[in-house]
From Swiss-Prot:
Natural source organism: Thermomicrobium roseum (strain ATCC 27502 / DSM 5159 / P-2)
GO biological process: cytoplasmic translation
Superkingdom per UniProt: Bacteria
Known partners and oligomeric status: Part of the 50S ribosomal subunit.
HAMAP family reported for this sequence: Ribosomal_uL6_B (MF_01365_B)
Protein name: Large ribosomal subunit protein uL6
GO-annotated cellular components: cytosolic large ribosomal subunit
Pfam families, per database record: Ribosomal_L6 (PF00347)
Similarity-based family: Belongs to the universal ribosomal protein uL6 family.
Highest classification ranks of the organism: Bacteria, Pseudomonadati, Thermomicrobiota, Thermomicrobia, Thermomicrobiales
Length: 184
């Protein structure tokens, strides 16, 4: 039995989990609604305020799906109650971020400002010109948008300039050493 897959998912107050006959799990909560289509043979049961994921057999494929689906459903429940947030930091002289309406505008050393429109369900928070927050209810989409922002100007290893995740450690490299005069 999968150690992760066998753990029940508690359903908090104000959250509704709906299981359709065509194996779609729909989670609705105060922040919105998320859907997940499951493999047709996987079994999801809801009873006594918890959701339990079960697999049809002990085949390797179903063992893999067991823990995955349990975690995805748990993330959906957490997303519609608390939401998810990924923070980014901007390092570099003159590098900054700003919001124009809902659009994120990045000035990161290019000849033009880079504009990023949020996909549906995602919003940006600019706490300071060097800190960006990506907020939403879908964990995968939040991470994807944060990675897309980081990709605009990834941190470089010599001076550390660029956009990085909050708390991310960048491995630094030593620069070139100069030639000594007189010796050949």
């Amino acid at each position: 039995m999968s150690r992760i897959g066998k753990r029940p998912i508690p359903i908090p107050a104000g959250v509704q989990v709906e299981l359709t006959p065509d194996n779609v799990v729909r989670v609705t909560g105060p922040k919105g609604q998320l859907e997940l289509r499951l493999h047709p043979k996987m079994i999801v049961q809801r009873e006594n305020g918890v959701v339990q994921v079960q697999r049809p057999s002990d085949e390797r494929f179903f063992k893999q799906l067991h823990g995955l689906y349990r975690t995805l459903i748990a993330n959906m429940v957490q997303g519609v109650t608390e939401g998810f947030r990924k923070d980014l930091e901007i390092h570099g002289v003159g590098y900054r971020a700003a919001l124009e309406g809902k659009t994120l505008v990045l000035t990161v050393g290019y000849s033009h400002p880079v504009r990023i429109d949020p996909p549906p369900g995602i919003s940006f928070i600019v706490e300071s010109p060097t800190r960006i927050g990506v907020v939403g209810i879908d964990k995968q989409l939040v991470g994807e948008v944060a990675a897309q922002i980081r990709r605009v100007r990834p941190p470089e290893p010599y001076q550390g300039k660029g956009i990085r995740y909050a708390g991310e450690v960048i491995r630094r490299k030593a620069g070139k050493t100069g030639k000594t005069k007189g010796k050949k």
